Amino acid sequence: MDKDCEMKRTTLDSPLGKLELSGCEQGLHEIKLLGKGTSAADAVEVPAPAAVLGGPEPLMQCTAWLNAYFHQPEAIEEFPVPALHHPVFQQESFTRQVLWKLLKVVKFGEVISYQQLAALAGNPKAARAVGGAMRGNPVPILIPCHRVVCSSGAVGNYSGGLAVKEWLLAHEGHRLGKPGLGGSSGLAGAWLKGAGATSGSPPAGRN
């Protein structure tokens, strides 16, 4: 962590229980799932949107983004993703590359396999390393590690618990079972067909 970071924290209620957001003026550091996990069957139980209070801009942006995710998912693309300042995003690594690809390519309502995501990050044989990157994701939901599933159609593991992953997928319209990986009409599908697993670079201003 940058020694100049003045860390601030805020919490908000969600269908998954309380979420704790932490960050500084330079960017968001973490999203922690504090509450008890829920089941996919409870997807209609959504608390009222959290108030967007004062604080570092990245925390306010993240609160607004999460409110949209849970309450206005059809408008999610209108809300900016906050700058990210966790140490994992401050230096080049395979984990950083995987997380950026996942954020930029796999959109709401899409899923991708561990192997496909490894290919997008430049190493098709690194599916296990992708799993490690998902476990180390400091900002779940925002960087959607819940959208990474097994090629077999199994949901796969999730740091927040299987019930949480199933809820998030159900919230995005997925039926559990064999998925249509990437979605041939979606951005992920376009990358998988046309990009040929090129690695690319993180977007400017996200260092």
Swiss-Prot record:
It is found in: Nucleus. Changing R128 to K/L: Slightly reduced DNA repair activity. Keywords: DNA damage, DNA repair, DNA-binding, Metal-binding, Methyltransferase, Nucleus, Phosphoprotein, Transferase, Zinc. GO terms for biological process: DNA alkylation repair; DNA repair; methylation; negative regulation of apoptotic process; positive regulation of double-strand break repair. DNA binds at T95, Y114, Q115, N123, R128, S151. One of its GO terms (molecular function) is DNA binding. Its main location: nucleus. It is an enzyme of class 2 (transferase). Its cofactor is Zn(2+). It catalyses: a 6-O-methyl-2'-deoxyguanosine in DNA + L-cysteinyl-[protein] = S-methyl-L-cysteinyl-[protein] + a 2'-deoxyguanosine in DNA; a 4-O-methyl-thymidine in DNA + L-cysteinyl-[protein] = a thymidine in DNA + S-methyl-L-cysteinyl-[protein]. The keyword Transferase applies. This enzyme catalyzes only one turnover and therefore is not strictly catalytic. According to one definition, an enzyme is a biocatalyst that acts repeatedly and over many reaction cycles. This is Methylated-DNA--protein-cysteine methyltransferase. It comes from Homo sapiens (Human).
